[in-house]
Amino acid sequence: MMKRYWMARAVFLAAAVSLAIACGPTSVGAQQTPPPPSFQTSGNPEFDAWRDDFARRAVARGRDPVVLGRLLRGVTPDERVIELDQRQPEFVSPVWDYVNNRVSERRITDGRALKSSIGDTLTAVEQRYGVPSGIILGIWGLESNYGEAALNWTPQTALSTLAYEGRRRAQFEGYLLALAEMVERGLASEGELRSSWAGALGQPQFMPDVYLTTAVDWDNDGHRDIWTNRGDVAASIGNYLNDRGWRRGEPVFDEVRLPNNFDYALADGTMRSVADWAARGVTRISGEPWAGSENLQAQLWLPAGAQGPALLLHHNFGVIRRYNNSDRYALVVALLARAMDGRASALVRPWPTQIGSLNREQTLELQTLLNGMGYDAGAVDGLFGSGTRRAVRAFQAAQNLPADGFPTATLLNEVRARAGVAVEAPREPRGLGRSGVRELQRVLNRLGYSAGPADGEIGTRTRNAIRAFERARGLEVRGRATDVVLEAARAAAR
């Protein structure tokens, strides 16, 4: 889903939409504004007041009151949407779990089957927009499982709820205006309008404003159908990336090998020429020479720190991030694309699963301690963003540690020690009750570990599944159903 795209648009939309809706018509001799639609109560007076006010302002800006009435009548705020929007997971899954869960055999198999089914269309789309079919399929698979994911909301309900909730009101009011325009122009019928909980539309999960500017009628049937028409979906994704600067024929990333005593502080997001990286001893992990690539620009990314894979990210990696502002997302798309072409879907260097990762509470503590020591980690929000990464890197450099900016329990204990805080001793895992065991069995089965029926009984199959999971995740192998194993399994399943 393109929820991170919203953040990049939020400031612009907040200013533009507020100004546009508030100002009203300005043309000389404009016809009198028609009355806004009327609505029966939703049972929520605050929502009713917002809806009436929004409809009035939208009509003043030229939206059709009849269409607005049809879209917004019967809409009530959806508490589930608000819950999903506000959730803050306690445990953010490590990058290796995120990647491995999404670059799955099922997604690869289904993507290859789709490529075989509509190969001619994908080839034509690639020729027009310059975006490889594997990249298009990678995004398609992530966004909607190639159209198999259920779209359980109407966008008018999702967007109205999020606009009413108020945290990003102008942004979501802008999406509602775009949705009304879609219907007014006959680009999509109200009956086919289905979305995610965040109001993202169809198989490519476009927000309504993106639909207006980017969706493609590939087969020229007069309809930009991103819900059921595979040609329109593929072309729309290709058009999106092309519009945002995709460079035909250039790579997305190169996995590389770093020399001994490499300065990890260079993994700071700075774009440098491949020739510059080569001069610093960086080589392709495949052993292939850099010939012909020296002038390309790339930044170094260490997704799991100094002990994990090292990647040079090229311009097109950043273009994929325009679809979803996440390095992890872009990496998964690129790995799926390789799999669509019959190449290996895994990186060469294995993930260092033994180092673990921090949960939200630990990240809050890390940020607090770093700020208190004079390393500016920014807001203490439990989110490991660029500010916290810079602070970690500065701390590591000051302590003569590899300045990879990657947070681990070992790093947190090092920060605690330097801050004069008692180092936390490892907590003895707590055993699960019957309901916890059932949940663990369900999650392990979903992850592909054969734990047997979810009956709450810890038999041989369940113990063996726990041991296999612990080995795969770098945990101490005990074969016990504990809160630590359940927490790790939940994170792996996200």
Show which residues each predicted segment covers.
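Short amphipathic alpha-helical segments at helix boundaries and their inter-helical linkers
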Residues: 39-40, 75-92, 144-158, 234, ...
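Surface-exposed patches in mature extracellular/periplasmic domains of secreted proteins
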Residues: 63-72, 132-138, 190-195, 221-225, ...
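Bacterial N-terminal signal peptides
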Residues: 11-22
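An acidic, Gly/Ser/Thr/Pro-rich helix-cap/linker signature
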Residues: 31-129
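Acidic/His-rich structured neighborhood in mature extracellular/periplasmic domains
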Residues: 93-242, 252-253
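Extracytoplasmic/secreted envelope proteins and their assembly/folding machinery
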Residues: 48-55, 65-72, 119-123, 133-137, ...
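Cell-envelope/ECM-targeting effectors and their regulatory/trafficking segments
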Residues: 24-30, 148-151, 163-165, 178-185, ...
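Bacterial N-terminal signal peptides that target proteins for export
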Residues: 2-13
